[in-house]
Regions:
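Hydrophobic membrane-insertion alpha-helices, especially the h-region
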Residues: 14-38
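Conserved polar/disulfide-associated segments of primarily extracytoplasmic proteins
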Residues: 6-14, 40, 65-178
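N-terminal "mature-domain start" segment
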Residues: 41-71
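Surface-exposed amphipathic alpha-helical segments
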Residues: 2-8, 63, 167-199
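Extracytoplasmic/secreted proteins, especially bacterial periplasmic and envelope-associated proteins
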Residues: 58, 102, 106, 185, ...
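Alpha-helical interaction segments
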Residues: 23, 52-54, 130
Length: 199
């Protein structure tokens, strides 16, 4: 009788061990599944096409799109507190002799009087699109103060990146603007945007 009781207890213990192992495996599988769903939701995109401007690109699905002049296309992450992360594309006429660096200088001249503490960080870096087209990449920073006088907030340093290319008699300016504290974690979104861009 003692042997039978011990045998039943061993069997019960073996079942418990398998139950524990199976529970751990299921829990890990569910965590991985949840992580996969989260990554999929964060990286979900929507397609934007504008045949008149010759632009086709995928942008983050949960961002607000705006197509009002002076830009062809602008999307903003409205879930951000403070400065809203922005990606925009605008075009300007460009003559045969116009260079991307001249457009970059003109942007600096236009922005300096309208933004606080505007400063060019890096200039004249070459950026190559997936179709091997060369363009100019420049980075800058400025201070953003919320225009609403009823909101008391600390000014935010904004970091911007411009990619300028000249095609078909027009300069195409792709701009990325983000809170400087979030630049490193947000630049991957801009890189995915550029990788999907067809001009």
């Amino acid at each position: 009788m003692i042997e039978e009781f011990g045998g039943a207890q061993d069997e019960y213990t073996r079942q418990q061990r398998w139950a524990h192992i199976l529970t751990i495996i299921v829990a890990v599988a569910m965590l991985l599944y949840g992580l996969n769903l989260r990554i999929g939701a964060l990286n979900a995109t929507q397609l934007y096409e504008n045949p008149e401007a010759g632009v086709r690109v995928s942008y983050p699905a949960n961002w607000l799109i705006d197509e009002v002049a002076p830009y062809v296309f602008r999307v903003r992450d409205m879930s951000r507190i403070g400065f809203k992360t922005t990606i925009q594309i605008e075009t300007q006429p460009a003559g045969d002799q116009t260079s991307a660096s001249a457009i970059m200088s003109q942007l600096d001249l236009n922005r300096a009087p309208t933004t606080d503490s505007y400063d060019r960080i890096a200039n004249n870096d070459i950026y190559i699109f997936s179709d091997e087209t060369e363009s100019l990449r420049g980075e800058y920073a400025f201070v953003f103060q919320d225009p609403n006088p009823f909101l008391q907030s600390i000014p935010i340093v904004v970091r911007g990146t411009d990619i300028i290319t000249i095609r078909g008699g027009q300069a195409i300016i792709i701009t990325f603007l983000v809170d400087a504290n979030l630049y490193d974690e947000s630049i991957a979104t801009f890189e995915r945007f550029l990788a999907s861009l067809e001009l």
